[in-house]
Amino acid sequence: MAYPFQLGLQDATSPIMEELTNFHDHTLMIVFLISSLVLYLISLMLTTKLIHTNTMDAQEVETVWTILPAIILIMIALPSLRILYLMDEINNPVLTVKTMGHQWYWSYEYTDYEDLCFDSYMTPTNELKPGELRLLEVDNRVVLPMELPIRMLISSEDVLHSWAVPSLGLKTDAIPGRLNQATITSNRPGVFYGQCSEICGSNHSFMPIVLEMIPLKLFENWSTSMI
């Protein structure tokens, strides 16, 4: 999860988030090199008094600054396209969870079970227990098995919402009348926090998301106790 004065991204918990982190570093390095070159050229222009008065054209330079940006854009586009396809790919999910956005809470339905559904509201500040996080805790967590592909079906009952969990690399719009899907695969157990990431009204800031990833055996015990 995020912490005060954090400079980097949240720790990656899913393969997709690991890919996104690597792509961020790859792109940032390219931007850093380009920025350094531009600053170097600007410093040369400000410090030198020499002027090429006889230079009317420079075909070699024009060729370089046409081809080089194209190569750089390709170096950015290819990894980006790969990640886009990976994010859309869903192979044999073991579980499907339907998520509905409301003003201002989330409801969840485990479609593989006959009667396993619940609403998830933010825990008020005056009801928090020691060690719990303000504006991030909920009364009912989404419990899921770790290391297994899980399909999330996301929609909304009223206005636009966005279901986002940064450490899993997830952000999917919840749109009324439309069903979007995303894949979750957690590499490790833990509790992961997210929030609604689309301004949806006066209580937009009070729609937290809490995922609890546990081993499959513990998930089976939990689902049995909930039915």
UniProtKB/Swiss-Prot annotation:
The UniProt entry, under InterPro entries, shows: CcO_II, CcO_II-like_C, CcO_II_C, Copper_CuA, Cupredoxin, Cyt_c_oxidase_su2, Cyt_c_oxidase_su2_TM_dom, Cyt_c_oxidase_su2_TM_sf
GO process annotations (BP): ATP synthesis coupled electron transport
Q: What GO annotations for molecular function exist for this entry? A: copper ion binding; cytochrome-c oxidase activity
Give EC number(s), comma-separated.
Answer: 7.1.1.9
A Pfam match is COX2
Q: Which residue ranges are assigned to the Mitochondrial matrix compartment in the record's topology?
A: 46-59
Q: Where does Cu cation A1 bind?
A: H161, C196, C200, M207
Cofactor(s) this protein cannot do without: Cu cation
| Superkingdom | Eukaryota
Catalytic activity, per the record? 4 Fe(II)-[cytochrome c] + O2 + 8 H(+)(in) = 4 Fe(III)-[cytochrome c] + 2 H2O + 4 H(+)(out)
Membrane-spanning residues where? Answer: 15-45, 60-87
Binding-site list for Mg(2+): E198
Where this protein primarily resides, as one coarse class?
mitochondrion
For membrane topology, the record states:
Multi-pass membrane protein
Q: Which UniProt keywords apply?
A: Copper, Electron transport, Magnesium, Membrane, Metal-binding, Mitochondrion, Mitochondrion inner membrane, Respiratory chain, Translocase, Transmembrane, Transmembrane helix, Transport
Q: Where does Cu cation A2 bind?
A: C196, E198, C200, H204
Q: Which residues lie on this side of the membrane: Mitochondrial intermembrane?
A: 1-14, 88-227
Q: Which PANTHER family match?
A: CYTOCHROME C OXIDASE SUBUNIT 2 (PTHR22888:SF9), CYTOCHROME C OXIDASE, SUBUNIT II (PTHR22888)
Instruction: Return the similarity comment.
Output: Belongs to the cytochrome c oxidase subunit 2 family.
The record's function comment reads: Component of the cytochrome c oxidase, the last enzyme in the mitochondrial electron transport chain which drives oxidative phosphorylation. The respiratory chain contains 3 multisubunit complexes succinate dehydrogenase (complex II, CII), ubiquinol-cytochrome c oxidoreductase (cytochrome b-c1 complex, complex III, CIII) and cytochrome c oxidase (complex IV, CIV), that cooperate to transfer electrons derived from NADH and succinate to molecular oxygen, creating an electrochemical gradient over the inner membrane that drives transmembrane transport and the ATP synthase.
Q: Could you identify this protein by its name?
A: Cytochrome c oxidase subunit 2
